[in-house]
């Protein structure tokens, strides 16, 4: 079966595109299109992995966000209060004048952890984010 390629248009900030192009060159990609296809495959694999997180888990959500963006700090606090039963701790510090780094430590049901992560990771103003999980360790 022949795979048909689709042409799409994407708008990106110039700085992000420049960094992407430099990364592609360093990694030896033959074209920007191949790099974008690889990035989309990785994104889709990560999403599929997140959908398989089930059962008791320990996890962290780490994020960098633009704290000067109107409403993001209060929105993050509101979301965290909605999931207070999962959150065991959080660490927050300022890495630049307008950017904060936060790590939220979680313990609970995998499906609820993913639900919380998706709410946070999709916020406008979140520049980098990562969900990391591991099976909950039980001592008997």
Swiss-Prot record:
Binds 1 nickel ion per subunit. Pfam families: NikR_C, RHH_1. Keywords: DNA-binding, Metal-binding, Nickel, Transcription, Transcription regulation. CDD domains: RHH_NikR_HicB-like. Ni(2+) binds at residues 81, 92, 94, 100. Its cofactor is Ni(2+). NCBIfam families: PRK01002.1, PRK02967.1, PRK04460.1. Belongs to the transcriptional regulatory CopG/NikR family. Transcriptional regulator. This is Putative nickel-responsive regulator 2. The lineage of its organism: Archaea, Methanobacteriati, Methanobacteriota, Stenosarchaea group, Methanomicrobia.
